[in-house]
């Protein structure tokens, strides 16, 4: 029974990661844009876990009020971080949220064709860099910093190379 439960958890986790991967590769017809952000550690000032949790709860409410369904993810960008992937968010809304929660940057992606996204690294409301790839390969899986991963996953990572 324990083996069956472990296999089921693995299946569920993989399906979550595969959903994220398919979105970032432009393979989900119902998703035309995506945003990434956290409310943690405003302007790179380290806060307590309790303070960060409260800020992310506020960000979740902000997104839901606007009709978005944020997906909880986690990662490491210098420090461990709990963040969100927000399907179908507008550029204006991700920029507004970044400013509201005093974030140095946010990421916005837009589908530009079949199976293709272009991602923007945005500071304030200015696009600083663009990339047309999200990485998932073995090199990404070995990263110890600067990656994101599906929250329930046992280590399946992804990375947009800004």
Place the predicted regions along the sequence by residue:
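Conserved short beta-strand edge segments in small beta-sheet-based binding/regulatory domains
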Residues: 103-117
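Short basic, glycine-rich beta-strand/loop surfaces that mediate nucleic-acid
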Residues: 82-87, 117-127
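Short, surface-exposed beta-edge/turn micro-motifs
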Residues: 31-34, 80-83, 102-105
């Amino acid at each position: 029974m324990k083996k069956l439960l472990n296999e089921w958890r693995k299946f569920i986790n993989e399906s979550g990661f595969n959903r994220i991967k398919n979105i970032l590769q432009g393979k989900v017809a119902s998703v035309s844009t995506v945003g990434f952000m956290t409310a943690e550690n405003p302007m790179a000032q380290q806060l307590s876990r309790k303070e960060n949790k409260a800020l992310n709860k506020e960000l979740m409410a902000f997104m839901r009020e606007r009709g978005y369904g944020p997906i909880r993810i986690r990662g490491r960008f210098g420090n461990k971080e709990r963040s969100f992937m927000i399907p179908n968010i507008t550029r204006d809304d991700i920029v507004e949220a970044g400013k509201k929660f005093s974030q140095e940057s946010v990421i916005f992606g837009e589908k530009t064709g079949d199976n293709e996204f272009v991602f923007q690294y945005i500071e304030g409301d200015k696009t600083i860099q663009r990339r047309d790839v999200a990485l998932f390969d073995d090199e990404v899986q070995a990263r110890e910093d600067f990656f994101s991963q599906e929250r329930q996953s046992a280590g399946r990572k992804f990375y947009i190379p800004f």
